[in-house]
Amino acid sequence: MAALAYNLGKREINHYFSVRSAKVLALVAVLLLAACHLASRRYRGNDSCEYLLSSGRFLGEKVWQPHSCMMHKYKISEAKTCLVDKHIAFIGDSRIRQLFYSFVKIINPQFKEEGNKHENIPFEDKAASVKVDFLWHPEVNGSMKQCIKVWTEDSVLKPHVIVAGAATWSIKIHNGSEEALAQYKMNITSIAPLLEKLAKTSDVYWVLQDPVYEDLLSENRKMITNEKIDAYNEAAVSILNSSTRTSKSNVKMFSVSKLIAQETIMESLDGLHLPESSRETSAMILMNVYCNKVVKPVDGSCCQPRPPLTLIQKLAACFFTLSIIGYFIFYVIHRNAHRKNKPCTDLESGEEKKNIINTPVSSLEILLQSFCKLGLIMAYFYMCDRANLFMKENKFYTHSSFFIPIIYILVLGVFYNENTKETKVLNREQTDEWKGWMQLVILIYHISGASTFLPVYMHIRVLVAAYLFQTGYGHFSYFWIKGDFGIHRVCQVLFRLNFLVVVLCIVMDRPYQFYYFVPLVTVWFMVIYVTLALWPQITQKKANGNFFWYLGLLLKLGLLLLCIWFLAYSQGAFEKIFSLWPLSKCFELEGSVYEWWFRWRLDRYVVFHGVLFAFIYLALQRRQILSEGKGEPLFSNKISNFLLFVSVVSFLTYSIWASSCKNKAECNELHPSVSVVQIVAFILIRNIPGYARSIYSSFFAWFGKISLELFICQYHIWLAADTRGILVLIPGNPTLNIIVSTFIFVCVAHEISQITTDLAQVVIPKDNPSLFRRLACTIAFFGGVLILSSIQDKSRL
């Protein structure tokens, strides 16, 4: 009864809401969100530096999130690279001195806070040619004015960056009097033109005063109240912002420290000075403001302009624009032709006569329609991760942000279960289900930033290995059973795997190796194909006639294993192979193939394990040792129970080991050899009981059919900044933002999967002469792209 109600309910839902309806809704949502963000940027401004300097919130303890953009955490080498031959000056009171110390410690963590506090403090890194000075001027007075005036008159002494601020001493010395505030306004007014003049050629920041924790203030500081601080800040802002009447002031207000202090001042030791973690955050913000445009970190979107379009991107834009125009012209012509062929009414009988000519969908129409849709989708990709239209945020990991969504999807997956069409081991529905739930877990892992939690990282590594295991299992099974080593099959698989990634490499200006998983499965597919296609070609049909063919296949697999082992422990040989042009253009990342070697080596044996498992399974199946009937256990009851017990123990043992990992490098070294234990254990647990083989989760299987597209699309339209951050379509509401962005992301992935399938039917013909002509055109196309890419790379140097 429950099953009947479920099926009726599902039909009712599908009647009113289909995948097509979902995609239309997603398109409307994208257009509305794009319009809202565009209007917001027109109204509030498009400068993310202003947001970085003025707004933000804490994601968690000590993790600051600027409004609308991502903040990069600078390493020592990056800071020195940015500040080479630069002079930075901090001028002000003890709070500015604290900021100076935190800034210098980014460059040199060993720098100590020592010496007389009420005097100038110099810092110089001669090797990096970086000079940072603190100048003790606790009040805005004639002394500070004279110092600033010298900089305006002497270009040699003038710093590249000036960070200034003072007020608490004026409040303290004059006991918070109104006369002191009036004098402060006069002094600020007198130095404002000088700061504005400096700001034309240098970066000038005025640091607004942070609030105090009045309960902790000593008796001689009790007059420094938050009310007084607000009055002094208001005076500084109004005067400095009005120092130029013709345009916006070039002196930047560093007001974000106030927000940071509001959350952390309770941790202060004296109620006046901020704790070290807060100072470090403010110093890192300063570093981002000045250095992001120089270093251009991927995970630092604040203060970075939109990257200029490359020649290849411009050509791609022209191609997609022409495709869209071409499709609309084709559509108008086709519609007019359809109107002419409308059913007409017979004058005698009054009945409609239907046109018996049914025009088939042409290859040209499929091509134009597919590229039209793909062009619009790529425009969305570009808007999300290149055009700075939508906002981005940093990831922040908590256990709840990872495990609660996992529980949600598991409940949904269990709820949507159906009977399988067949009950064989790793049948199609089951492998789709396996891919689906693994992909959903990996997506949650990426968006939650769970890679920082080692036990989760190690289990996710097994899921990635399981994908590669399926690659070995699936491709070996196909070639072994069907013996189809034709070029058509190879082209189909390569097109299915690589089409989206190649388009993204062109549109998003990213190297092929950036989407590391696709090169990985592509290379392993070719390795399996070459291993089995080379003479002698051994298939199941041939091996059944002579047992020695089995030995021949095992010899081939043994040689493959030997090659894998050699390349895994010979980094030099591996890098020489993949550093050859044009392979280097495909497998290099930032001028090195090390990343490719690391990725390949991390799961080097699991594809071989998949091939070996498929060989053993098919051999057992051929000899009818397995019982794969509906509801039947895979083996006899005793053997099945024993294998189930061993599998459960092995599965849990691996999880306990992975959860107890302390060192990522050591665990990664063991992972290639031991990941197969949990994979095979899972397969046996899932397939030995007959009832488990007979059902599958249609929810997970649906996602499994588009798992490749989900994995690739997440880089730019769900995550952001090339997976380093999170895309923000709806600011201020993280839960609603995730729901909306996920909905659009899944719809896009599904549509791209359909586009790839449609194009594969047209682009890859079954007759060899046509196929070879297409291959020649493809080679010429990639040759042109590689040449243009090489020219672009040289122009960037």
Swiss-Prot record:
<feature type="transmembrane region" description="Helical">
    <location>
        <begin position="726"/>
        <end position="746"/>
    </location>
</feature>
<dbReference type="GO" id="GO:0000139">
    <property type="term" value="C:Golgi membrane"/>
</dbReference>
<feature type="transmembrane region" description="Helical">
    <location>
        <begin position="514"/>
        <end position="534"/>
    </location>
</feature>
<keyword id="KW-1133">Transmembrane helix</keyword>
<dbReference type="InterPro" id="IPR036915">
    <property type="entry name" value="Cyclin-like_sf"/>
</dbReference>
<feature type="topological domain" description="Cytoplasmic">
    <location>
        <begin position="535"/>
        <end position="546"/>
    </location>
</feature>
<feature type="topological domain" description="Cytoplasmic">
    <location>
        <begin position="747"/>
        <end position="770"/>
    </location>
</feature>
<keyword id="KW-0812">Transmembrane</keyword>
<keyword id="KW-0012">Acyltransferase</keyword>
<keyword id="KW-0808">Transferase</keyword>
<feature type="topological domain" description="Cytoplasmic">
    <location>
        <begin position="693"/>
        <end position="698"/>
    </location>
</feature>
<feature type="transmembrane region" description="Helical">
    <location>
        <begin position="600"/>
        <end position="620"/>
    </location>
</feature>
<feature type="transmembrane region" description="Helical">
    <location>
        <begin position="487"/>
        <end position="507"/>
    </location>
</feature>
<feature type="transmembrane region" description="Helical">
    <location>
        <begin position="462"/>
        <end position="482"/>
    </location>
</feature>
<dbReference type="Pfam" id="PF07779">
    <property type="entry name" value="Cas1_AcylT"/>
</dbReference>
<feature type="transmembrane region" description="Helical">
    <location>
        <begin position="396"/>
        <end position="416"/>
    </location>
</feature>
<dbReference type="GO" id="GO:0005975">
    <property type="term" value="P:carbohydrate metabolic process"/>
</dbReference>
<dbReference type="GO" id="GO:0047186">
    <property type="term" value="F:N-acetylneuraminate 9-O-acetyltransferase activity"/>
</dbReference>
<feature type="topological domain" description="Lumenal">
    <location>
        <begin position="792"/>
        <end position="797"/>
    </location>
</feature>
<feature type="topological domain" description="Cytoplasmic">
    <location>
        <begin position="335"/>
        <end position="363"/>
    </location>
</feature>
<feature type="transmembrane region" description="Helical">
    <location>
        <begin position="440"/>
        <end position="460"/>
    </location>
</feature>
<feature type="glycosylation site" description="N-linked (GlcNAc...) asparagine">
    <location>
        <position position="175"/>
    </location>
</feature>
<feature type="transmembrane region" description="Helical">
    <location>
        <begin position="19"/>
        <end position="39"/>
    </location>
</feature>
<feature type="topological domain" description="Lumenal">
    <location>
        <begin position="720"/>
        <end position="725"/>
    </location>
</feature>
<feature type="transmembrane region" description="Helical">
    <location>
        <begin position="672"/>
        <end position="692"/>
    </location>
</feature>
<feature type="topological domain" description="Lumenal">
    <location>
        <position position="461"/>
    </location>
</feature>
<protein>
    <recommendedName>
        <fullName>N-acetylneuraminate (7)9-O-acetyltransferase</fullName>
        <ecNumber>2.3.1.45</ecNumber>
    </recommendedName>
</protein>
<feature type="topological domain" description="Cytoplasmic">
    <location>
        <begin position="621"/>
        <end position="638"/>
    </location>
</feature>
<feature type="topological domain" description="Lumenal">
    <location>
        <begin position="660"/>
        <end position="671"/>
    </location>
</feature>
<feature type="topological domain" description="Cytoplasmic">
    <location>
        <begin position="483"/>
        <end position="486"/>
    </location>
</feature>
<feature type="transmembrane region" description="Helical">
    <location>
        <begin position="639"/>
        <end position="659"/>
    </location>
</feature>
<feature type="topological domain" description="Cytoplasmic">
    <location>
        <begin position="417"/>
        <end position="439"/>
    </location>
</feature>
<feature type="transmembrane region" description="Helical">
    <location>
        <begin position="547"/>
        <end position="567"/>
    </location>
</feature>
<feature type="glycosylation site" description="N-linked (GlcNAc...) asparagine">
    <location>
        <position position="46"/>
    </location>
</feature>
<comment type="similarity">
    <text>Belongs to the PC-esterase family. CASD1 subfamily.</text>
</comment>
<feature type="topological domain" description="Lumenal">
    <location>
        <begin position="508"/>
        <end position="513"/>
    </location>
</feature>
<feature type="glycosylation site" description="N-linked (GlcNAc...) asparagine">
    <location>
        <position position="187"/>
    </location>
</feature>
<feature type="active site">
    <location>
        <position position="273"/>
    </location>
</feature>
<keyword id="KW-0325">Glycoprotein</keyword>
<feature type="transmembrane region" description="Helical">
    <location>
        <begin position="314"/>
        <end position="334"/>
    </location>
</feature>
<feature type="topological domain" description="Lumenal">
    <location>
        <begin position="568"/>
        <end position="599"/>
    </location>
</feature>
<feature type="topological domain" description="Lumenal">
    <location>
        <begin position="385"/>
        <end position="395"/>
    </location>
</feature>
